Amino acid sequence: FNDLRIGVKATYQNWGMKLEMGYAGNKVAIKDAFATYSYKNSSIQIGQFYEPFSLDMICSTFDLRFNQSPGAVLALTNSRRMGVAYSYRTQYYYLCGGFFTDNDLSNLKNASQGYAIDGRLVYRPLYEQAKLVHIGLAAIHRTPDGTLPEDENRNTFTYKSPGVSTIDNRTLIQADVDHAASQFKIGTELLIYYHK
């Protein structure tokens, strides 16, 4: 199997829960593991899930337009991380902000953690049956791991990508930025849809 998934979802009144495990490359990894509390147009999510940064990263695997997210997206965004996020949504607006560690449940590190503060805003000035204008802006401020003093990768950000296929998961592109104090990234989204 390239990627075998098994998971469970549960809901009770205003609460939701999701746990999903993945098996790929002879390794088992926890994918999603979170609880959500929703009230009216707001929700709070805590656990391990995608940071609200790139639309290509946070959409479901079933909704991907190609076999894999673009290589640039894989290199410049993070996978799932442990954290907490607040979301507010209406028909025309979506706002999400969160605080995340640099750990995921499948790769717990014995180190001083970096952290990230994320935010995403979406505005849909036109949102009808056959017409849509979607404008989005997202930002992340991240600090690197304060790893143990004897580690060579202290205060380093790594950008890497396996390319456009998960069949061969070897890293094709990698760049390390060392002696980093923090990083700040901005992402934009624009979608215009019109159907006669």
Set out the residue ranges of the language-model regions:
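Surface-exposed beta-loop-beta
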Residues: Q113-K196
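Outer membrane beta-barrel
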Residues: F1-L105, K109-P144
